[in-house]
């Protein structure tokens, strides 16, 4: 009899209702500890409003309509909430930077949600505290609707790490009526594999998009993010596990250009933090993060998922909601590569080079020239160069070349060859991610390290 079900305990708060430690909130395999969330007054959730009228200084608003009415909040704008994760705070630079970027491209109520009173705790405690924060956000959204007639479909919640699951809880409590939730590397421990009630899932909003950047297992790799698909669209940049630029050595990372605190954060959780950096970059680069529908990153890297399907490719990040098929299915997976430093956007091209001239061993490189700019030289092939053979590769250019007007070909082999062989490209075909094809031709051959320009055939 003693082994019977133990009645769970619960805590209740007047505005927000009751929180129990019953299953699935606690006492399940993924969350064995029976822990209750802290009180709303301890967590002290705050809403920091940035607007086009005051882009650099926030106004503190609450779910009381008088504070909203006396602020720069406008009901004819979308409202985007940005929610930080574990140990973080609402005044951290990245949240304000995200608002700043949003205010450059749109008229918006941008609200940074600060819950540092609940995020700076033992991790298992923080995972319970998010339930109260989610309830606070839902209460705020409900107040906007009941007091100002503001529709939840105009609300977009962007959450990083634990903040993704705060967004999920707020969405669940508003019955999935919120317009959009974006999960930026949703936290894995205590959430991966749990029932949908506990974590972010596609029923939490009309549209849910997710960026996965740190999907390695928490043990032993310390991957903080979920590898599980939890949205309508799930993006896996660079495969979703190891982000380029995150493998720097410890000292260079900590004494980073952004100062000790940013550097230390980047060292401890570089992959995990990349998700919000990609999102911020995407706001100002509407075409720079095309995601390709694919079964896996290996398949994508083997050049098997190009170009975009007839409906186009969704853009990872801010403009994911422009994708026509966004809610056709759940858990649609998309892959792409990004840059490794400040400018993360990339544009993918397929290049097919048909060689002419002598048979040699060497490297073939091509650069693209177009209405939007000029790309670097990208290696298309290295090995035995056979005239009449076509070599195909895909590149990720840091420049959106636009309509391609000409291409330049160069080859080298670094072996002294007294016969001075000449190699050329009789044709180069470039395919853009929208499927548009550009063809270029040349009759000439060149010695190594000499540029050959090909013009439209």
From Swiss-Prot:
One of its GO terms (biological process) is lipid catabolic process. Coiled coil: none annotated. Residues 347-457 form the PLAT domain. Its EC number is 3.1.1.3. Inhibited by bile salts, is reactivated by (pro)colipase/CLPS. Keywords: Calcium, Disulfide bond, Glycoprotein, Hydrolase, Lipid degradation, Lipid metabolism, Metal-binding, Secreted, Signal. One of its GO terms (cellular component) is extracellular space. It holds the Pfam family Lipase. Residues 1-7 form the signal peptide. The active site is at residues 161, 185, 272. GO terms for molecular function: all-trans-retinyl-palmitate hydrolase, all-trans-retinol forming activity; lipoprotein lipase activity; metal ion binding; triacylglycerol lipase activity. It catalyses: a triacylglycerol + H2O = a diacylglycerol + a fatty acid + H(+); 1,2,3-tributanoylglycerol + H2O = dibutanoylglycerol + butanoate + H(+); 1,2,3-tri-(9Z-octadecenoyl)-glycerol + H2O = di-(9Z)-octadecenoylglycerol + (9Z)-octadecenoate + H(+); all-trans-retinyl hexadecanoate + H2O = all-trans-retinol + hexadecanoate + H(+). Glycans are attached at residue 343. Transmembrane segments: none annotated. Disulfide bonds join 12-18, 99-110, 246-270, 294-305, 308-313, 441-457. It is found in: Secreted. Ca(2+) binds at residues 196, 199, 201, 204. SUPFAM superfamilies: alpha/beta-Hydrolases, Lipase/lipooxygenase domain (PLAT/LH2 domain). Its main location: secreted. Plays an important role in fat metabolism. It preferentially splits the esters of long-chain fatty acids at positions 1 and 3, producing mainly 2-monoacylglycerol and free fatty acids, and shows considerably higher activity against insoluble emulsified substrates than against soluble ones. Forms a 1:1 stoichiometric complex with (pro)colipase/CLPS. This is Pancreatic triacylglycerol lipase.
């Amino acid at each position: 009899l003693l082994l019977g079900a133990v009645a769970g305990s619960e805590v209740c708060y007047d505005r927000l209702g009751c929180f129990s430690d019953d299953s699935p909130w606690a006492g399940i395999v993924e969350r064995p500890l029976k822990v209750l969330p802290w009180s709303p007054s301890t967590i002290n959730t705050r809403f920091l409003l940035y607007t086009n009228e005051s882009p650099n200084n926030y106004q503190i608003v609450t779910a009381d309509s008088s504070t909203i009415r006396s602020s720069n909040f406008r009901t004819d704008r979308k409202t985007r909430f940005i929610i930080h994760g574990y140990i973080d705070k609402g005044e951290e630079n990245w949240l304000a930077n995200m608002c700043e970027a949003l205010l450059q491209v749109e008229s918006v109520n941008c609200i940074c949600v600060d819950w540092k009173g609940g995020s700076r705790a033992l991790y298992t405690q923080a995972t319970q505290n998010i339930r109260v924060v989610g309830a606070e956000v839902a209460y705020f959204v409900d107040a906007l609707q009941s007091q100002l007639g503001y529709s939840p479909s105009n609300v977009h919640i962007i959450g990083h790490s634990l903040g993704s699951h705060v967004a999920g809880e707020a969405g669940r409590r508003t019955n999935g009526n919120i317009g959009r939730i974006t999960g930026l590397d949703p936290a894995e421990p205590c959430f991966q594999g749990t029932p949908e009630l506990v974590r972010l899932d596609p029923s939490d909003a009309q549209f849910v998009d997710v960026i996965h950047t740190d999907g390695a297992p928490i043990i032993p790799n310390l991957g903080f993010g979920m590898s599980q698909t939890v949205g309508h669209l799930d993006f896996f940049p660079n495969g979703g596990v190891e982000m380029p630029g995150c493998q720097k050595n410890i000292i260079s990372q900590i004494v980073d250009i952004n100062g000790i605190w940013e550097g230390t954060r980047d060292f401890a959780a570089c992959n995990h933090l990349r998700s919000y950096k990609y999102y911020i970059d995407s706001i100002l680069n509407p075409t720079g993060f095309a995601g390709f529908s694919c079964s896996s990153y290996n398949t994508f890297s083997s050049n098997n998922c190009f170009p975009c399907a007839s409906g186009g490719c969704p853009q990872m990040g801010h403009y994911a909601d422009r994708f026509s098929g966004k809610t056709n299915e759940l858990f649609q997976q998309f892959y792409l590569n990004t840059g490794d430093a400040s400018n993360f956007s990339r544009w993918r091209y397929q290049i097919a080079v048909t060689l002419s001239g002598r048979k040699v061993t060497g490297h073939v490189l091509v650069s693209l020239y177009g209405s939007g700019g000029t790309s670097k030289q990208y290696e298309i092939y290295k090995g035995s160069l056979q005239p009449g053979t076509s070599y195909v590769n895909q590149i990720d250019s840091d420049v959106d070349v636009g309509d391609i007007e000409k291409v330049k070909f160069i080859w080298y082999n670094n072996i002294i060859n007294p016969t001075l062989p000449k190699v050329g490209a009789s044709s180069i075909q470039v395919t853009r991610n929208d499927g548009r094809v550009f063809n270029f031709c040349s009759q000439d051959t060149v010695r190594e390290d000499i540029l050959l320009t090909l013009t439209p055939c």
